[in-house]
């Protein structure tokens, strides 16, 4: 009676080598021929909509957060005084 092959061994090594060689071939850079990529269109001049600098968006977001915190502090102080 032959015993079943143990896990691992020569076949597993062959599969690993084949898998790694296929991954190298699959990871080769592919040229993108689609000129209407939506992710690239966001940063191009062809994008429609409002164009705002990212730094402006950052300052507006921080200003909004600051105003919300200030309103909370004002309401707490006003609640204790009146």
Swiss-Prot record:
Region described as Disordered: spans on this chain: 1-36
Keyword Transmembrane helix: yes
Membrane topology of the entry: Single-pass membrane protein
Sequence ranges of Polar residues compositional bias: 19-36
Keywords: Endoplasmic reticulum, Membrane, Protein transport, Translocation, Transmembrane, Transmembrane helix, Transport
GO molecular function: guanyl-nucleotide exchange factor activity; protein transmembrane transporter activity
Domain of life: Eukaryota
Subcellular location: Endoplasmic reticulum membrane
One GO term of the biological process aspect: post-translational protein targeting to membrane, translocation
Any Pfam family hit: Sec61_beta
The keyword Manganese is annotated on this UniProt entry: no
GO cellular component: cytosol; endoplasmic reticulum; endoplasmic reticulum membrane; membrane; rough endoplasmic reticulum membrane; Sec61 translocon complex; translocon complex
Residue ranges of the TM segments: 54-74
Ranges facing Cytoplasmic side: 1-53
Cystine pairs: none
Signal peptide (from-to): none
Function per UniProt: Part of the Sec61 complex, which is the major component of a channel-forming translocon complex that mediates protein translocation across the endoplasmic reticulum (ER). The functional states of the translocon complex include co- and post-translational ER import, cotranslational membrane protein integration and retrograde transport of misfolded proteins out of the ER. In the cotranslational pathway, ribosomes synthesizing presecretory proteins are targeted to the translocon by the cytosolic signal recognition particle (SRP) and its ER-localized receptor.
Description of how the protein assembles with itself and partners: Component of the heterotrimeric Sec61 complex, which is composed of SSH1, SBH1 and SSS1. Presumably three to four Sec61 heterotrimers assemble into an oligomeric ring with a central aqueous pore. In cotranslational ER import, the pore diameter varies from 9-15 A in a ribosome-free resting state to 40-60 A in a functional state when associated with the ribosome. The Sec61 complex is part of a channel-forming translocon complex whose composition seem to change dependent upon different functional states.
Family, per entry: Belongs to the SEC61-beta family.
Protein name (Swiss-Prot/TrEMBL): Protein transport protein SBH1
Gene that produces this protein: SBH1
């Amino acid at each position: 009676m032959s015993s079943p092959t143990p896990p691992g061994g020569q076949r597993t090594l062959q599969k690993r080598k084949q898998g790694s060689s296929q991954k190298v071939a699959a990871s080769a850079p592919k040229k993108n021929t689609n000129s209407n990529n939506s992710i690239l269109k966001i940063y191009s001049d062809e994008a429609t909509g409002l164009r705002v600098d990212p730094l402006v968006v950052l300052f507006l977001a921080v200003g909004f957060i600051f105003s919300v915190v200030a309103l909370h502090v004002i309401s707490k102080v006003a609640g204790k005084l009146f």
